[in-house]
Amino acid sequence: MSARAAAAKSTAMEETAIWEQHTVTLHRAPGFGFGIAISGGRDNPHFQSGETSIVISDVLKGGPAEGQLQENDRVAMVNGVSMDNVEHAFAVQQLRKSGKNAKITIRRKKKVQIPVSRPDPEPVSDNEEDSYDEEIHDPRSGRSGVVNRRSEKIWPRDRSASRERSLSPRSDRRSVASSQPAKPTKVTLVKSRKNEEYGLRLASHIFVKEISQDSLAARDGNIQEGDVVLKINGTVTENMSLTDAKTLIERSKGKLKMVVQRDERATLLNVPDLSDSIHSANASERDDISEIQSLASDHSGRSHDRPPRRSRSRSPDQRSEPSDHSRHSPQQPSNGSLRSRDEERISKPGAVSTPVKHADDHTPKTVEEVTVERNEKQTPSLPEPKPVYAQVGQPDVDLPVSPSDGVLPNSTHEDGILRPSMKLVKFRKGDSVGLRLAGGNDVGIFVAGVLEDSPAAKEGLEEGDQILRVNNVDFTNIIREEAVLFLLDLPKGEEVTILAQKKKDVYRRIVESDVGDSFYIRTHFEYEKESPYGLSFNKGEVFRVVDTLYNGKLGSWLAIRIGKNHKEVERGIIPNKNRAEQLASVQYTLPKTAGGDRADFWRFRGLRSSKRNLRKSREDLSAQPVQTKFPAYERVVLREAGFLRPVTIFGPIADVAREKLAREEPDIYQIAKSEPRDAGTDQRSSGIIRLHTIKQIIDQDKHALLDVTPNAVDRLNYAQWYPIVVFLNPDSKQGVKTMRMRLCPESRKSARKLYERSHKLRKNNHHLFTTTINLNSMNDGWYGALKEAIQQQQNQLVWVSEGKADGATSDDLDLHDDRLSYLSAPGSEYSMYSTDSRHTSDYEDTDTEGGAYTDQELDETLNDEVGTPPESAITRSSEPVREDSSGMHHENQTYPPYSPQAQPQPIHRIDSPGFKPASQQKAEASSPVPYLSPETNPASSTSAVNHNVNLTNVRLEEPTPAPSTSYSPQADSLRTPSTEAAHIMLRDQEPSLSSHVDPTKVYRKDPYPEEMMRQNHVLKQPAVSHPGHRPDKEPNLTYEPQLPYVEKQASRDLEQPTYRYESSSYTDQFSRNYEHRLRYEDRVPMYEEQWSYYDDKQPYPSRPPFDNQHSQDLDSRQHPEESSERGYFPRFEEPAPLSYDSRPRYEQAPRASALRHEEQPAPGYDTHGRLRPEAQPHPSAGPKPAESKQYFEQYSRSYEQVPPQGFTSRAGHFEPLHGAAAVPPLIPSSQHKPEALPSNTKPLPPPPTQTEEEEDPAMKPQSVLTRVKMFENKRSASLETKKDVNDTGSFKPPEVASKPSGAPIIGPKPTSQNQFSEHDKTLYRIPEPQKPQLKPPEDIVRSNHYDPEEDEEYYRKQLSYFDRRSFENKPPAHIAASHLSEPAKPAHSQNQSNFSSYSSKGKPPEADGVDRSFGEKRYEPIQATPPPPPLPSQYAQPSQPVTSASLHIHSKGAHGEGNSVSLDFQNSLVSKPDPPPSQNKPATFRPPNREDTAQAAFYPQKSFPDKAPVNGTEQTQKTVTPAYNRFTPKPYTSSARPFERKFESPKFNHNLLPSETAHKPDLSSKTPTSPKTLVKSHSLAQPPEFDSGVETFSIHAEKPKYQINNISTVPKAIPVSPSAVEEDEDEDGHTVVATARGIFNSNGGVLSSIETGVSIIIPQGAIPEGVEQEIYFKVCRDNSILPPLDKEKGETLLSPLVMCGPHGLKFLKPVELRLPHCDPKTWQNKCLPGDPNYLVGANCVSVLIDHF
């Protein structure tokens, strides 16, 4: 400016620059470092001049260099080392090495006026000047990547310049200047003393920098470029800022009077831009920053504009303060900032003269330049820090590290501000502004098009105009998306004032170069790409965003992934900020919802590490969310750390490493002492590490060694301390032991735990690691590598937050001393620093860490029960969460919707979700009924409630986990773990539920009627249009509502919440992929919306709308069915849905399946398959395959859903897989076994009685069952595969096998109505057959031996047929027909009406609802009574006939004795006909369906395969031999477990299978009267215990009651009681964690234990044709050889001991044994190391075996 001013003042004088050399000694200051930022270098030449000098790009105010160094000073030497022609990094390194003092020799350009005669000898001066200026500017932009930027050269510079000073004009002038003969002279004045004066008086003049063609000025001809403006409208302009001059011009109101003086030599035009210098000064926000920025600029070719911007802060503290400066300082003057500071600048125009000038000074300069630029950024309103920070030319708006210092460095471009080309346009906004925008924060916002006849066009805006400001909002550094949104958000009719500047040439270059936005972001959530062009990413990845309006549409950003060494790796699409926030919020919020327990775990895996106790960990994690404070996308800039970064070491020998470093290198490293924390500190963590403590160490120029948790690391990053996090990766457990023995023999820490925790830490928090060192136990080479790594990291540029830590300071995590409060805050994660004990201990100090390790151990212990050990919060979270969580959340939530069929992973993820929440599993166990309960309004609700209570006492933890997994077959497995307790509890509770909870109320209680509806919707959606519906809408609805359930799985069991719980589980998954879900919703909105809406209504009789699709069914068992659909019942009923999909039999099958499921659940529960998240993942994946996907998505959304139909869906027939009997039982329905099937079939009828069923306890149980199924499916894709045939047999691994007749299925807990209730719930789940859809996504579909979609379609057709034809008339028969044959069809038809649409959506919800109703009613008349109102009304008629049959399933076997699940409808009816009948009358039909479902679930597992599973299209397989019924369970082999789980009733295990067999045939044989017959048949078929277990309900007499009670009974019967399974569990001294059994035929199937995640996938053809082979397996834990399990963390068995049987069985084709392995690799390795048939997948270890 001085040059300009001088030139302006005297044309006779020529401005020349001379170079003065000064040597200064800088003393490093704690907060500032040396207080300078440098740019340039051989590798980062000035983008315009090409100068390679090292330039001071910024001088921090108040820093050591203030007053000594100035911006644009060329660094000649540092400590005697020449800086000529060196690389930027070298210069930075020299400064870093200088220690506390640095002797810097600089050359400073001094501009002097010389007579015109005196030629300016130094051509360089121009170049240098330019480069100087440019450099300065560059630094701003350049720090970010001066080299590239510079190479982008004039253009980028222009870009930034244009923002800072009008780009083209300046560059033009520059170019002109260069062309001019007189070149600037370099002048350097070096002060010998600080207070010495230069003796110069500078002035500035406004001159005409550019005249636009065809403009008034051009036409007038009296004004020429280079003219000095003396007056504007009578006001003298000397020393006037550009901003003021611009203002004067703006006020001219159409008439502008100016007095100009011609400068023939155009000296001013030839003067190199000083703006850049100033800019540069600004750019040099910090000395360190400049380096980083320049690197950043290199990093992003365009970020040169902002390079210096972020060279802020030596210490985070300083950084925050300077960051402001730097931000502004970034080269491109952040116009927004500029504006705000512009004003300041304007006040100090002279500041320009001294390069050292403050940021404000820079601002003034900017002001001049700002004419153009300033115009852009002039509006202080845009001081918006972030956009403002992004310099005009700065590619990375957020890149500038320093947030505010160079506020308006951009202003430096003030020269452009007053350009003649500028125009101020005012108009009223019409429907739109009428503008199309181009460009972005890197180049400015340009008008790409103007709508003809729009106000903007009329006012003269045209293409190529740069929008500098809109309504006082600076547009110079704003990203295009923000600009568009800002214009869109302007109210119609509001006056719009746009300051624009004509820059057609720049615009042309922008368009040609396709540049616009350029800024860097760091991701803080995990995302799975939604399209082939998308980019998936994990936390902590960095991207350069180059287009925020990809394809001209809002929603997606075009970004480039930044790989190692800051190189741009790949380009693709990522969600925009808004969507990212939603996705991230879902991921982080999920855990908070009910069922969030588990979710929290997953979500807070890293955070958890800070918590000691498993339980405490879980609670604490929920209570104090560890989720990062960072936004989904954190704007970052690459800069150098101006301070010694704290060092955090993770790994098994971290404690040793810290002590060794501090001991051997005390001058470099110091351990940060922890201070006692207020009450409640972790045992091991003596306290917290205060930020103040860290700061003190940093101020001593030492690395603070921190023993903190990953959570604390995240907080430190947020506070911008950017710790160096080194992970010492152990080579093996033994290696850890060896090293610790050698390094710290006195340590008592467990090498095993340290090793495991390290694995978990790596899995969950790898994104926090800055470097990883692989340990070699043979030597101590790690120590040298550690020191080297720390030094290397310290010298590297760091991606730092562009702005101040918004929450950091406010969060107590002040960048200053306050930060200590952040760290110290007892509640803060920082507090966990010390707590690190937990975190660290997770990996390092296992033994001493009583708390943490205890946690771990506790977790492991809990793991057995809960399946989600908190372990170290980090570990546990990471294990399940990482894979599961991300997969789960992501896939479940997002993925399933994405690829309903290709979502095996999602299923896994779902698995994970199901698996991951231990609480969910628990809830599931508890909600075996609860799930049903969600689906079974009355029973479900009631059951859920009681169940909750009981389960809570018994084994809520396990049950909770189950629910999450329960949604699919996995859920079944999941349930299995808690089956015993859950079953038992459920039995007790269910009766209670039905007695003390009105089904309706319960359903209501579901608390989320909408949610329930959603869940139902989800299930139903799947049935109706599972592909899109459930993935999207329902999942969302379901997930969120269920999430809460997850948290209170028991609760959910207790209340409809169970249902919700599922939802929550899904929500967890969903949250992760919330967006995806949304997407899905978009995909399925129509149907899902429909369903969703219906579902919303669905909670109650509202189902009728659903009736269209599933209306009747749903209504009948609105929730119950929903439960079944969503839950497991849908599975059974879902089989019908599948049937609708491909065959009606699914309806039957579902019923049967449900029954079977109930029976099997006991074993399943026993198995705890559900409980085992890992196991779940497989089923999850498995189920997902085809239908599964859709269903799964829905189910994913709602676990309940997933298990219900999702899995069933996938299996198609295999729906039974989860409720093994679900589908197969359908077939047996006709025969004795079909009777069981009828149960399944009946689940379809339940839709008619949905209202009742919703209330039905049975329904609730069904819900659980369904959930289990879902989970199982999720968990084991293979399970699903076999599901078709195997599902039937699968449900009760041991029990089923033992009780071929189906009695075992029912039998497990036929003794009590509670059990029945559970059964009902299971039955309720039967509707889950929707799951088959889930299955398809995985593999299960193939195993299922029928295409779920095919099935679905067939089922749909049949359902519609059935719905219309006998939905109302013969629900029982319908079930039977659907499940078994003709009867099933009627039932099916009934269901179908609801189911037809619903079935495609996963009829299960409806079925579930019905089942639930059944369960509840059957379970308890009382419940039945509550449900009746909703259910009966819709299903009263239809359900009447079937009710008897359905209830029969419930027979005492199911209820009382796990074994004698007694699908005896008669018994069932008899048992609880009275209460239910009244309610069930309408729902009676449905209840029978439910009962059928129960039977089907129970026996159906056997019959279902035959009927529905095997021949997905067969509707009238009611005459399935009992054997077949039994066989049906095969597909449900896995299902069986879910059943068990669902019912958590040991009793169910034993009788479930036999009863099922017996009942199924009967049921299947009967159509309208089939229920009764079935009941009788079941009675007969059922073994005595089955009978005893069955509470018979007269099918005809007590249809309503029968339905409700029946359902309750069936569900109880279906689930193999956990106790039964567990009884088996403790065999031979082994602890049987889970048991699964099922009967499979040549169609194959999947036998899975949701709880454990173990599954056997039996391919088609593995079993000879015509052979129905019962297969079982037990998952044992031999504590003597297996490490403790952290079930809470989702850690199943690290090395599961799986006992398969029967021994000696040989397969024609190898069967796949899948062992879940979420986190533990030791597990994988232990399984079958070296075996070619052994495959370690993401979530499981797969072993191929050809014999047992």
Curated annotation (Swiss-Prot):
Any single Gene Ontology cellular-component annotation? plasma membrane
Positions with biased composition (Acidic residues): 123-136
| Residue spans of biased composition, Basic residues class | 102-112
Q: Which UniProt keywords apply?
A: Calmodulin-binding, Cell junction, Cell membrane, Cell projection, Gap junction, Membrane, Phosphoprotein, Repeat, SH3 domain, Tight junction
Q: Where is the composition biased (Basic and acidic residues)?
A: 149-175, 299-327, 357-377, 879-892, 998-1014, 1110-1125, 1269-1286, 1336-1347, 1403-1420, 1538-1547
Using the record's annotation, list all stretches that form the SH3 domain: 516-584
Q: Where in the cell is it found?
A: Cell membrane; Cell junction, Tight junction; Cell junction; Cell junction, Gap junction
Instruction: Cite the domain annotation text.
Output: The 244-aa domain between residues 633 and 876 is the primary occludin (OCLN)-binding site and is required for stable association with the tight junction.
Show the PANTHER family listed in the entry: TIGHT JUNCTION PROTEIN, TIGHT JUNCTION PROTEIN ZO-1
- Identify this protein by name: Tight junction protein 1
Per the UniProt entry, what species is this protein from, by scientific name? Homo sapiens (Human)
